[in-house]
UniProtKB/Swiss-Prot annotation:
It holds the Pfam family Maf. The record marks 11, 71, 155 as: Important for substrate specificity. The keyword Cytoplasm applies. GO terms for molecular function: dTTP diphosphatase activity; UTP diphosphatase activity. Keywords: Cytoplasm, Hydrolase, Nucleotide metabolism. This is dTTP/UTP pyrophosphatase. It is an enzyme of class 3 (hydrolase). One of its GO terms (cellular component) is cytoplasm. The keyword Hydrolase applies. Its main location: cytoplasm. One of its GO terms (biological process) is nucleotide metabolic process. It is found in: Cytoplasm.
Length: 188
């Protein structure tokens, strides 16, 4: 059966290729602003991932396995999205430096042939070291933080700020592979 990744993220595409050799990418145009955060970050990321997957399911005219995910960075139970601009990136990174924060991913797998849907979420604790303002500004100049939740990419230059990680590394990148592997086995 065809496998579809409902994501434009090159990071998710690269990660999924470690589990599945052949899959299609169909970018979901689900409006994430329709999902209202009501206090549970687990529920929030699962609801967005479900919205993305259902958006693709409703367009298909053949059976498929659909995979979608959403990842957010949180500190003090506040969601840190992608920065609006360089100043916002600076403020986000500054708020993370020297502190622990949590990265949550919601993952949804749909088997349209069986009309089955599995939703899971995972959190990973990340601790940043102390970072000088100059280091933050140099990092922002690379452009890397501008399209990432929490304004950093652990798999890129932003990884140098990480002092400690507790949990799934791939969750922080955007697709928790171990969790997804078991979800795919369960839904077959």
């Amino acid at each position: 059966m065809k496998v579809i990744l409902a994501s434009a993220s090159e990071r998710r595409q690269e990660l999924l290729s470690r589990l599945i050799k052949t899959f299609d990418v169909i970018v979901s145009n689900f409006d994430e602003s329709k999902v209202i955060f009501e206090g549970s970050i687990d529920r929030y990321v699962k609801d967005i991932a479900l919205g993305k997957a259902m958006n693709i399911k409703n367009k298909l005219d053949e059976d498929a396995i659909i995979i979608s995910a959403d990842t957010v960075v949180t500190i003090d139970n506040m969601i840190l999205g992608k920065p609006r601009d360089e100043e916002d990136a600076f403020n986000i990174i500054k708020s993370l430096q020297g502190r622990k924060h949590l990265v949550y991913s919601g993952v949804v797998v749909i088997n349209t042939a069986k009309n089955l849907t599995i939703q899971e979420s995972l959190s990973t604790e990340v601790t940043f070291s102390e970072i000088s303002d100059d280091e933050i500004l140099e990092y922002i100049k690379t452009g890397e933080p501008l399209d990432k939740a929490g304004a950093y990419g652990i798999q890129g230059i932003g990884g140098i700020f990480v002092e400690e990680i507790r949990g799934c590394y791939y969750n922080v990148v955007g697709l928790p592979l171990n969790k997804l592997k078991f979800m795919l086995k369960e839904i077959q």
